[in-house]
Swiss-Prot record:
One of its GO terms (biological process) is division septum assembly. Keywords: Cell cycle, Cell division, GTP-binding, Magnesium, Metal-binding, Nucleotide-binding, Septation. This is Probable GTP-binding protein EngB. PANTHER family: ENGB-TYPE G DOMAIN-CONTAINING PROTEIN, MSS1/TRME-RELATED GTP-BINDING PROTEIN. CDD domains: YihA_EngB. One of its GO terms (cellular component) is cytosol. Belongs to the TRAFAC class TrmE-Era-EngA-EngB-Septin-like GTPase superfamily. EngB GTPase family.
Length: 211
């Protein structure tokens, strides 16, 4: 039976401008990625039932660092810099994108990717690039269509079906679900997927086994 992790115990570990400043590359990391207004921080706060675990901001693109959170020893969640921001100097934008790309390509402990998209504007070019990259390197993806409370039930189901249909083109392990931090919708499915991903890989050597 898959272990259920207590995400309420998640705590902040460190922020890093690039992978060279991250802790040792061991254990299991699940990363959260998305456009700068997709609701990443809100989703992490909802998942962990903590109001301010991840800083939320009215200003898109405030997540400028790779932020690591630990659920328990060797089990981590990662909040990646938002992409697709407009109100940012070009040089800084390139710096963030380089840090994001390095993490995705070189971090061995990365074992799953949650890509968050506003349900009203899903599958933008950068979103598709993010999913395609993960599929290319055999990393499973969970697409969360955030702010689902902004659409009526019928429109929500229609959008979900359209994105699921579009996801088939990636020909990889890509699951699509709706999510609302406000209504707590989709939280159980997110937790279940994280539990499954964390269970798929044995803990890092030296980590205490927990039943």
């Amino acid at each position: 039976m898959t272990k259920s992790y207590n995400y309420k115990l998640t705590h902040f570990v460190t922020s890093a401008p690039d992978i060279r400043h991250l802790p040792v590359d061991s254990g299991i990391e699940i990363a959260f990625a998305g456009r700068s207004n997709a609701g990443k921080s809100s989703a992490l706060n909802t998942l962990t039932n903590q109001k301010s675990l991840a800083r939320t901001s009215k200003t898109p693109g405030r997540t400028r660092l790779i932020n690591l959170f630990e659920v328990e020893s060797g089990i981590r969640l990662v909040d990646l810099p938002g992409y697709g921001y407009a109100e940012v100097p070009e040089e800084l934008k390139r710096k963030w994108q380089r840090a994001l790309g390095e993490y995705l390509q070189m971090r061995d402990s990365l074992k799953g990717l949650v890509v968050l998209m506003d349900i009203r504007h899903p599958m933008k070019d950068l979103d598709q690039q993010m999913v395609q990259w993960a599929v290319d390197v055999n990393i499973p993806v969970l697409v969360l269509l955030t702010k689902a409370d902004k659409l009526a039930s019928g429109s929500r189901k229609e959008q979900l079906n359209q994105v699921r249909e579009a996801a088939l083109a990636f020909m990889g392990d890509v699951q699509v679900e709706t999510f609302s931090s406000l209504k707590k919708q989709g939280v159980d499915k997110l937790r279940q997927k994280l539990d499954d991903w964390f269970a798929a890989i044995p803990p890092a050597q030296g980590s205490p086994e927990t039943e």
